[in-house]
């Protein structure tokens, strides 16, 4: 597992922040308080989940020496990265899942978790549909229907917008 990679601090932070919204403070599995990071051929894939909803994103690394995967607590890494201005971050992960994040003015030491404990996202099967929409089209549709949504904890189904793709 020993691995090392270099990635942009603000690029990584914005990707982590975008998918962190799915992480619930009342998770049934402690591993779901973490981001799953998987490095394959220079691409860092990041996953966040609450077991019902899974969000994933990816970012290109500047440099990487091997493939690997680990989980890291979302709050810990977000709090560490939000204070760092744009610069390259060097991540070093050893066999004990100790993560050293080096930056210009110092380093952070974090404890990772075994990625094998992270639940796999459900396979969508053969009847999944892939749709590409421009951001303005999607935002226009959301803005036109947002008025009809509720903020009711007792009826969570009313809190969202239903997409019917046929």
Residue ranges and their predicted role:
Residues 1-166:
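Structural preference for solvent-exposed beta-strand-turn elements
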């Amino acid at each position: 597992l020993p691995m090392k990679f270099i990635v942009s601090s603000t690029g990584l932070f914005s990707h982590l922040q975008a998918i962190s919204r799915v992480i619930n403070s009342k998770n049934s599995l402690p591993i779901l308080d973490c981001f799953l990071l998987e490095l394959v051929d220079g691409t860092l894939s990041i996953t966040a989940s609450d077991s019902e909803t899974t969000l994933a994103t990816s970012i290109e690394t500047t440099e990487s020496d091997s493939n690997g995967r680990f989980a890291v607590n979302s709050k810990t890494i977000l709090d560490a990265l939000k204070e760092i201005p744009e610069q390259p971050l060097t991540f070093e992960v050893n066999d004990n899942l100790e993560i050293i994040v080096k930056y210009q003015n110092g380093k952070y030491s974090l404890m990772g978790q075994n990625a094998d404990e992270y639940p796999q996202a459900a396979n969508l099967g053969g009847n999944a549909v892939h749709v590409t929409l421009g951001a303005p089209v999607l935002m226009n549709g959301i803005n036109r229907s947002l008025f009809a949504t509720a903020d009711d904890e007792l009826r969570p189904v009313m809190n969202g917008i239903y997409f019917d793709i046929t």
